[in-house]
Structures are given as structure tokens and as C-alpha cells.
């Protein structure tokens, strides 16, 4: 049997956020973002594409309304290190648009990193796996205090049949410090 093309979609949540939200990361979240490039590279190799929601989208956080930059700030260091652009064409609630985009033939043999908001990311992963008759019962809900999980969807494009499988991994970055990095500070 001929092996199909495999598309690997690696989904991460943004880094830690302040109590009031502010659309932003905490220093611990920034430290996570700075550590992510090497973690993701070691686990999945260099991606072909990176996605994050449109940072112009406004979100209501406990501290008020803010532009939602957390996912982009989280994946930005990886994009810089890998020399890749970040596709921000979709708002954080537009998981249908994201799913339609990532199921286009251009992505069939690619590794794609997606940084997003965890509730919508959970919905996206479930919808994507279900669309290829995959088993969604094995997909856990993404917990509110979980910044470390990696949800991975592998779409295998075979002869006449496309399937999707889910697996869960972890960044292993929960023990990072909560002080902001200060390069060059005495």
C-alpha cells in the first residue's frame, strides 16, 4: 500500500497571561515564547508555515478591551528564528476559516505551527479531526491553566481516503522563571 502525504498541524496555546488579561503576556509567558523555538524544532522540525490570529481583533479581558496579541507574541520568536512569516489572516474566533485554509492541497505534506486561544483551539482541533472521521473522544478539553500542552493533528492524504489522528505532547516549559529577560542589564 502506498504511503500518503502527511500534514502535521502543531497547535500551541499562547503563553501565560496577566490576571487582567490586557491582551498581553506576562514575563513568564515571554520566557515561554523565547524558549519555544528550540522545543518545537526538536520535537517537530522546522515548519513550512506558521499561523496566529489577527492581532487587530479586539478581545474583552477582565481589564477591558484590548487587541489580542498573545498568540502572535508567543509564536513570534519561533517565526524569527526559523525565518518564516506568520499568517494572521484569521480572527481568533474564525476557526472555520482556519480549518478551510489548512485543508487546502498546498499544505498536504507540510508541518504547520498554529498558536491560538485555547478554547477556540480546542474547538478547531475537534472540528478538524471530526471532518476526516477521526476519533474526537480521545481529545481532552484544554484546561484554563494549561499553557504547556501541544495538540497535534496528523492528516494523512492517501489514495482515495484522507484520515486525521490526534496526539498530545507537552512543551515541558512550566518551570520557567517569572522575571522578564533583560539582555545587557548589569
Feature-to-residue mapping (PLM):
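Active-site-proximal alpha-helix that buttresses catalytic centers in soluble enzyme cores
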Residues: 1-109, 120-186
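Periplasmic-binding protein-like
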Residues: 111-115
Amino acid at each position: 500500500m502506498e504511503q500518503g502525504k502527511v500534514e502535521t498541524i502543531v497547535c500551541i496555546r499562547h503563553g501565560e497571561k496577566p490576571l487582567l488579561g490586557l491582551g498581553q503576556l506576562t514575563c513568564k509567558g515571554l520566557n515561554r515564547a523565547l524558549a519555544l523555538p528550540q522545543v518545537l524544532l526538536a520535537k517537530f522540525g522546522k515548519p513550512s508555515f506558521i499561523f496566529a490570529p489577527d492581532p487587530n481583533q479586539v478581545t474583552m479581558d477582565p481589564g477591558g478591551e484590548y487587541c489580542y496579541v498573545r498568540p502572535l507574541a508567543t509564536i513570534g520568536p519561533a517565526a524569527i528564528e526559523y525565518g518564516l512569516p506568520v499568517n494572521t489572516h484569521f480572527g481568533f474566533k474564525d476557526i472555520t476559516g482556519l480549518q478551510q485554509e489548512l485543508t487546502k492541497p498546498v499544505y498536504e505534506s507540510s508541518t504547520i505551527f498554529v498558536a491560538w486561544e485555547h478554547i477556540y483551539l480546542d474547538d478547531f482541533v475537534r472540528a478538524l479531526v471530526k471532518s476526516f472521521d477521526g476519533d474526537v473522544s480521545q481529545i481532552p478539553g484544554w484546561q484554563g491553566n494549561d499553557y504547556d500542552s501541544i495538540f497535534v493533528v496528523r492528516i494523512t492524504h492517501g489514495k482515495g481516503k484522507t484520515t486525521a489522528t490526534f496526539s498530545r505532547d507537552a512543551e515541558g516549559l512550566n518551570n520557567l522563571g517569572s522575571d522578564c529577560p533583560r539582555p545587557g542589564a548589569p
